[in-house]
C-alpha cells in the first residue's frame, strides 16, 4: 500500500479544515478591514467637508485656527495694552466732574479720573493727571460709591477698571500724567473729604509702586498712592482718611480685605481737601519697578494683584481686620476701584496726596503740609507693609473687596522684588567672604614681617642683597593692611612653629639663604660696574674667589687689571664668603667657554697677544699651579697658533674639508705630525683639536724633552702614549707616522673623552703657545699625502698593530681608504691622474696603493694590517660608493634645472628643438610652453 493510500483521508480532512478556517479568518479580516477603512474614509471625508465648508484651503484653516488660538492666549496679555484705547469712565449722576476734581483742583486744572473720586472723590484735574489708567476705573467705582453712599463695590478687573492711559473722556489728566506708564492696580487712596479732618487713604503714604505717579505735581494723592501701590503691593491697605491727619494711614488699615475690587469711596458730600491732600500727598515718582498698567479694561495685573493683595492682606489682614469694623463706616474718597489693586501692590495713596506734591519717595506721605501719620512714613521699599490706621468711620463708605482680577502679571511681582536689590547683597557678601578667606596673604605677610626685621642688619652686612630683597617684601607687607599684618604676626608664631620649613626659614634661615640669591645679582652689579666694558673681565674676577686662589695672576699680560678686579671683588666679597662660593662656580665655566670660542675665532696674532696671557691664568686658577708646567702654555700656544694657521690655508686649498683624516693618514711619516694638525684644524675643530690639546696638556713635559721633534712631535708622541703606553720605544719617525694615523683616529674617537676630562681652555692656550713653527710644514704634507709614499703607512700600521690594538689599525685603515679616494679627487684638481676619478682607479702606483690600503684587492705590502681592515673596509667603501653615486645625480639635476630655468625665457628656438622627453619629465610646464611659447616668442621678437 502506498503512503497516499494509507493517509489520504487524514490529509484531505486536514486540508479541508485548514481551508475552511483559513477562509473564515480571511473573510473576517477582510470585513473588519473594509469596515475600518470605510469608517476612516467617511470620517476623513466629513472632516474635509467641514473644513471645505468653513474655508477653502486647509492651510488657511490651520492658520486661522492658529491665529484664533494665538489671540485667545494673548487676551490676558492684551489686557496689558495701552489704556489709551479705552475711553475714560463716564461721570456718575450728580457728578459734575470726577470726584477727585471736586475735592482737589490740581494746578494742571485737569479733572482727575474717577480713580481719584474713587479714592477720595477729589475733582482735582491734576489728580486726574496723577491717576493712572487703572485709577480712572477705580475713580468710577469710588464716584459711584460716593453717589451711592457707602457701596461695597468690587472694582472690575484692573484692565476693565483702568481707563486707557491716554484716554481722557472727561477733563482727565491722563495725558498730563507721566505715570500713565505706571498702572496702579489697586490704588484705593482713601482721602477724607474734609481736608483738615482726614486724609482718606493711608495708601498715599505707602506709595503703591505699580501706579506710583511721577506725573503732575498735583495729581490726586489717591491716584498717586494707587500708582505707588502698584509697585508697593504691601502698601495696599487703605489708610484711614483723616482730613485732619496729614498722614496716610497704612493702606492695610483702610482695606484689610482690600482686594482688586476693594474700593473705599469717599462720600461725595465730603469737601474734598485735595489741595491739602495735594499739599500733604506729594507726587511720588514711580518706583523703578513700577509696571505701567494696560488700558483699565484690560485685566493685566489682576491675578498678580490678587497675589500681592493676598500677600498684603495676609500681612495687613490683622490691621485690616482691626479696621474692618471701620471699613463699612470708612468713607474713603481716595479709595477707588484702584483701591482693590492697591492692597495688593501697595497702599493706595490717599487722594489727599497730590502727585503734584514733590514727594517722589515711595514711602513719602502724599500730604504735603502734613507729615505721614499712623506709621505711614515715606516707603522706600515697595513691599513694606505699613501699620493700618483706623479710617474715620464718618468718612468711610463700606468697602467691598473686589477679588476680580482678570489679568495675571507675575512679572510685576518680579519687578518689585528686583528693585529691592537682593542680588547685590550676596555680591557684597561674597567679597566680604573672600576678604575673610585669605589665608595665603598671611604667609606672605609673615615673609614681609621677617624681611622688615632683616633690612636693618642687612644694611650693615649685605646692603646690596638684603636691602633690595627686604624692600620688595616690605612693600608687599605695606600693601597688606595693618590688620592683616597684626593677624599675620599672630599667625607667624603659630605657623612658624607648625611650618618651620617655611616661616622658620624665612625668619631665621631665610636671613642666611636669601642673601646669596640677591647677592649673586649684587656680585653681578658690583663687578659689572667695573667690568661692563668687557664680558671676559666679569668672569675672571668671579673665578678666583671660587677656588679662593688669588695668586694665579702671574701669567699676565692682561691679567694685571683682572687681578686688580679680582682683588677688589674679593675685598668686597670678603664679608660674604659663602655667597662668593655659591656664585662663581657656574659663571667661570661659562665665561671660559665663551673665551675659548672667542679665542678660537680670533686671529692667531690676537690669540698670541690677548688670549694667551689670560687663559693660563684661568688654567692656573682651575688647576693647581704646581701641576702646570711652564712649557705647556708655549707648546699649546704654538700648536694652537699652528692649527689656526693651518685652518686658514688647508681650507682654501682643499675643497672637501670634512674628511681631513684620510689625507693625514696618506701623508708621509715625516709630515704626519703636520698633517695631523692640518686635518684636525680643518675637520675636527671640535674633536681633533681638543684631543691633541689634551694630549699636549698631559704630555707636554715629554715634548719639552723631545726638543728635536719640537712642536710637531709633542702631540703625536703624547697621544700615542695615552692610547698605548706599551710601545714607547719606537723610533721618532715611526712614532710620528703612528701618531699621524692613530692620533687622527683617537682624536676622532676619543676627543670627547679628553674634552670631558680636560677643559678645552688649557688645550687651546697651550696649543697656541707651541704652534709657531707649524704653519710652513703644513703646506708641504698635503702633496706628500698625495704622494706614493702612502703605502708605507700600512707597514707602520702593522708595526703598531703588534704593539697596539688591532681595532685602531682597522679604523685607521678605513680612514686611509676614505681619504685616499678623496685624495684622488684632490689629485684631479691638482693635476694628478684623472683616471682616479672613478671609484676603481686604472692600474697604477696610486691605484695599487689604494687597493692595498683598502684591502679589497691583494695587499702585498701590509699583510699584517689586512686582517683588521678586511672586516671594516667593505662597509666603508660601500658607503663611499653610495656617496659618490649620489652626488653626481644631484649635479646632473641641478644643471638641467638651471639650464631649463633660463631657457623658458630665452626658449625658444633651439630650446624647444634641443630638449626632449627628459626635459618634459623634469618640467611638465615646459611642454605647455613649447606649444604656446613660439607664438609668444614671435611677439617678443617683434617687440625686440
Curated annotation (Swiss-Prot):
Residues 93-105, 130-158, 245-267, 306-318, 625-640, 664-673 have a biased composition (Low complexity). InterPro entries: Aim3. The modification Phosphothreonine is found at residues 726, 858. It is a peripheral membrane protein. It is found in: Membrane raft. It holds the Pfam family AIM3. Residues 374-390, 859-876 have a biased composition (Pro residues). One of its GO terms (biological process) is barbed-end actin filament capping. The keyword Lipid metabolism does not apply. One of its GO terms (cellular component) is actin cortical patch. Residues 70-84, 483-497, 521-536, 606-623, 746-756 have a biased composition (Basic and acidic residues). The keyword Phosphoprotein applies. Residues 36-54, 885-896 have a biased composition (Basic residues). Residues 59-69 have a biased composition (Acidic residues). Interacts with RVS167. Belongs to the AIM3 family. This is Altered inheritance of mitochondria protein 3. The gene is AIM3.
Amino acid at each position: 500500500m502506498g503512503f497516499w493510500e494509507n493517509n489520504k483521508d487524514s490529509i484531505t480532512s486536514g486540508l479541508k479544515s485548514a481551508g475552511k478556517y483559513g477562509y473564515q479568518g480571511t473573510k473576517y479580516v477582510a470585513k473588519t478591514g473594509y469596515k475600518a477603512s470605510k469608517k476612516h474614509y467617511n470620517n476623513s471625508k466629513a472632516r474635509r467637508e467641514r473644513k471645505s465648508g468653513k474655508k477653502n484651503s486647509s492651510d488657511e484653516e490651520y492658520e486661522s485656527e492658529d491665529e484664533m488660538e494665538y489671540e485667545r492666549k494673548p487676551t490676558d496679555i492684551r489686557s496689558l495694552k495701552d489704556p489709551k484705547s479705552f475711553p475714560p469712565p463716564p461721570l456718575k449722576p450728580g457728578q459734575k466732574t470726577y470726584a477727585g476734581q471736586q475735592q482737589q483742583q490740581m494746578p494742571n486744572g485737569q479733572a482727575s479720573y474717577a480713580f481719584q473720586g474713587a479714592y477720595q472723590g477729589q475733582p482735582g484735574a491734576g489728580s486726574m493727571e496723577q491717576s493712572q489708567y487703572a485709577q480712572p476705573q477705580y475713580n468710577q467705582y469710588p464716584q459711584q460709591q460716593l453717589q451711592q453712599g457707602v457701596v461695597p463695590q468690587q472694582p472690575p478687573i484692573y484692565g476693565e477698571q483702568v481707563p486707557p492711559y491716554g484716554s481722557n473722556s472727561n477733563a482727565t489728566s491722563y495725558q498730563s500724567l507721566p505715570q500713565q506708564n505706571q498702572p496702579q492696580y489697586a490704588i484705593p487712596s482713601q482721602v477724607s473729604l474734609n481736608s483738615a479732618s482726614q486724609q482718606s487713604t493711608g495708601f498715599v503714604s505707602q506709595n503703591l509702586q505699580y501706579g506710583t505717579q511721577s506725573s503732575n505735581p498735583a495729581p490726586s494723592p489717591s491716584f498717586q498712592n494707587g500708582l505707588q501701590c502698584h509697585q508697593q503691593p504691601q502698601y495696599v491697605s487703605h489708610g484711614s482718611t483723616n482730613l485732619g491727619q496729614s498722614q496716610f494711614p497704612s493702606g492695610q488699615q483702610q482695606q484689610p480685605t482690600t482686594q482688586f475690587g476693594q474700593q473705599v469711596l469717599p462720600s461725595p458730600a465730603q469737601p474734598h481737601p485735595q489741595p491739602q491732600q495735594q499739599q500733604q500727598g506729594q507726587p511720588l515718582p514711580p518706583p523703578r519697578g513700577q509696571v505701567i498698567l494696560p488700558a483699565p479694561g484690560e485685566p493685566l495685573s489682576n491675578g498678580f494683584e490678587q497675589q500681592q493683595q493676598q500677600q498684603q492682606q495676609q500681612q495687613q489682614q490683622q490691621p485690616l481686620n482691626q479696621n474692618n469694623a471701620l471699613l463699612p463706616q470708612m468713607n474713603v474718597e481716595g479709595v477707588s476701584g484702584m483701591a482693590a489693586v492697591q492692597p495688593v501692590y501697595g497702599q493706595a495713596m490717599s487722594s489727599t496726596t497730590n502727585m503734584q506734591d514733590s514727594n517722589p519717595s515711595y514711602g513719602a506721605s502724599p500730604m504735603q503740609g502734613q507729615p505721614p501719620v499712623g506709621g505711614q512714613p515715606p516707603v522706600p521699599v515697595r513691599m513694606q507693609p505699613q501699620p493700618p490706621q483706623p479710617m474715620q468711620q464718618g468718612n468711610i463708605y463700606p468697602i467691598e473687596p473686589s477679588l476680580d482680577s482678570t489679568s495675571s502679571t507675575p512679572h510685576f511681582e518680579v519687578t518689585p522684588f528686583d528693585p529691592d536689590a537682593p542680588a547685590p547683597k550676596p555680591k557684597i557678601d561674597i567679597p566680604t567672604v573672600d576678604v575673610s578667606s585669605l589665608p595665603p596673604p598671611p604667609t606672605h605677610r609673615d615673609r614681609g614681617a621677617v624681611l622688615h626685621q632683616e633690612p636693618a642688619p642687612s644694611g650693615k652686612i649685605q646692603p646690596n642683597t638684603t636691602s633690595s630683597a627686604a624692600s620688595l617684601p616690605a612693600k608687599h607687607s605695606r600693601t597688606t593692611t595693618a590688620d592683616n599684618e597684626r593677624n599675620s604676626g599672630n599667625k607667624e608664631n603659630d605657623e612658624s612653629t607648625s611650618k618651620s620649613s617655611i616661616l622658620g626659614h624665612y625668619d631665621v634661615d631665610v636671613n642666611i639663604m636669601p642673601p646669596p640669591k640677591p647677592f649673586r645679582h649684587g656680585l653681578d652689579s658690583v663687578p659689572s660696574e667695573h667690568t661692563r666694558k668687557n664680558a671676559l673681565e666679569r668672569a675672571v674676577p668671579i673665578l678666583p674667589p671660587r677656588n679662593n686662589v688669588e695668586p694665579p695672576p702671574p701669567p699676565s699680560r692682561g691679567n694685571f687689571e683682572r687681578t686688580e678686579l679680582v682683588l677688589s671683588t674679593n675685598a668686597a666679597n670678603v664679608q660674604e664668603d659663602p655667597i662668593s662660593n655659591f656664585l662663581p662656580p657656574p659663571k667661570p665655566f661659562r665665561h671660559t667657554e665663551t673665551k675659548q670660542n672667542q679665542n678660537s675665532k680670533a686671529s692667531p696674532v690676537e690669540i698670541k697677544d690677548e688670549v694667551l696671557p689670560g687663559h693660563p691664568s684661568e688654567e692656573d686658577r682651575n688647576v693647581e699651579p704646581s701641576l702646570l708646567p711652564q712649557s705647556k702654555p708655549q707648546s699649546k700656544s704654538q700648536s694652537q697658533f699652528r692649527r689656526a694657521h693651518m685652518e686658514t690655508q688647508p681650507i682654501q686649498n682643499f675643497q672637501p674639508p670634512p674628511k681631513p683624516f684620510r689625507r693625514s693618514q696618506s701623508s708621509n711619516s715625516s709630515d704626519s705630525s703636520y698633517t695631523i694638525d692640518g686635518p684636525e684644524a680643518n675637520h675636527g675643530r671640535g674633536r681633533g683639536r681638543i684631543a691633541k690639546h689634551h694630549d699636549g696638556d698631559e704630555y707636554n713635559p715629554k715634548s719639552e724633552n723631545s726638543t728635536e721633534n719640537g712642536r710637531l712631535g709633542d702631540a703625536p708622541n703624547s697621544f700615542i702614549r695615552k692610547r698605548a703606553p706599551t710601545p714607547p720605544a719606537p723610533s721618532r719617525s715611526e712614532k710620528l707616522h703612528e701618531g699621524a694615523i692613530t692620533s687622527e683616529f683617537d682624536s676622532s674617537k676619543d676627543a670627547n673623552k679628553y674634552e670631558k676630562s680636560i677643559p678645552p681652555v688649557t688645550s687651546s692656550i697651550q696649543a697656541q703657545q707651541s704652534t709657531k713653527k707649524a704653519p710652513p710644514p703644513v703646506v708641504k704634507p698635503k702633496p706628500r699625502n698625495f704622494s706614493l709614499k702612502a703605502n708605507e703607512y700600512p707597514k707602520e700600521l702593522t708595526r703598531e698593530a703588534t704593539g697596539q690594538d688591532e681595532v685602531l689599525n682597522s679604523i685607521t685603515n678605513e680612514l686611509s681608504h676614505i681619504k685616499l679616494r678623496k685624495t684622488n679627487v684632490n689629485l684631479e684638481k691638482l693635476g694628478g691622474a684623472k683616471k682616479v676619478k672613478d671609484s676603481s682607479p686604472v692600474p697604477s702606483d696610486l691605484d695599487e696603493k689604494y687597493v692595498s690600503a683598502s684591502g679589497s684587492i691583494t695587499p702585498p705590502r701590509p699583510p699584517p694590517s689586512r686582517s683588521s681592515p678586511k672586516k671594516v673596509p667593505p662597509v666603508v667603501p660601500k658607503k663611499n660608493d653610495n656617496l659618490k653615486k649620489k652626488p653626481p645625480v644631484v649635479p646632473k639635476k641641478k644643471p638641467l634645472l638651471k639650464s631649463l630655468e633660463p631657457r623658458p625665457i630665452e626658449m625658444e628656438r633651439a630650446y624647444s628643438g634641443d630638449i626632449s622627453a627628459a626635459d618634459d619629465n623634469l618640467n611638465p610646464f615646459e611642454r605647455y610652453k613649447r606649444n604656446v611659447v613660439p607664438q609668444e616668442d614671435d611677439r617678443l621678437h617683434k617687440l625686440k
